[in-house]
């Protein structure tokens, strides 16, 4: 996709996309590595550092060999395994925990007031600090993630739209079903430490089901998250072996291309692992950061595909650049300082400020030319 941006606009606009997509790939790799290793630590007692190394190494080894083909196979395997877990584990937990009444009792969350906060100050805080970035980040996700463009280009043109719609429904049910385990935890009165909230499902399963269920969940998590890791390896290999390679090398040499791609994979593995070792790092902070970043290119990318004549090179470069440089740091500061105004403002500037600036500068630029 960045190649399309280069041809349509310029190299410097392409650079914005490459930097954004590399940061996103690194964060996506890190969050899944952290989620998997932390879950395995809870269920097995093995320090998460060791499991993180193992997960990254396994995904790296077979990605070196087969690349994008491996991601197709592992994604298919992942969806089968995860759906098996949804069908077997979730109903079993609900039944043993006391049935649907326990789920209903947990709808209000640990405090019991979650279902009644609409219209209150607390609802505004939840929306400003989490809801806005999470919702908009998910909407804009595919537009700022190189792995989605890879999948689109790997599918026959006539099947792209249908494939993405069907895939969304197949996967969309999974987080809804797995989310019921969180309500079970709240409804049954389980006390889960704040630093372990990200592994709630694993704790709930271990609390209500026998050891075999936890072992299967370990396998499910490992298989599912390793599949995501290899997707990011494939994504970064595409960028380093194609986009970055083509910037500095005019002659295409297959061996050198593969070398660039593999170096990119290794660097991604190291960077992602180092992020997981940051003291106090949480899944939530990583997710919200890259959700805001990738959503900043969402609307400009959509317009560039559908109505490219509305945009100019300067509009794309300065519009997205200014919005990202101002909005993302503002959002990060707001999260670290626990400042609601900064958090919400950063989200809005990065996402909506981006498209407003892109269109405004493009319009001004075209007037100057005419």
Positions of predicted regions on the chain:
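Membrane-embedded helix-loop-helix hairpins and adjacent transmembrane boundary segments
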Residues: 1-370
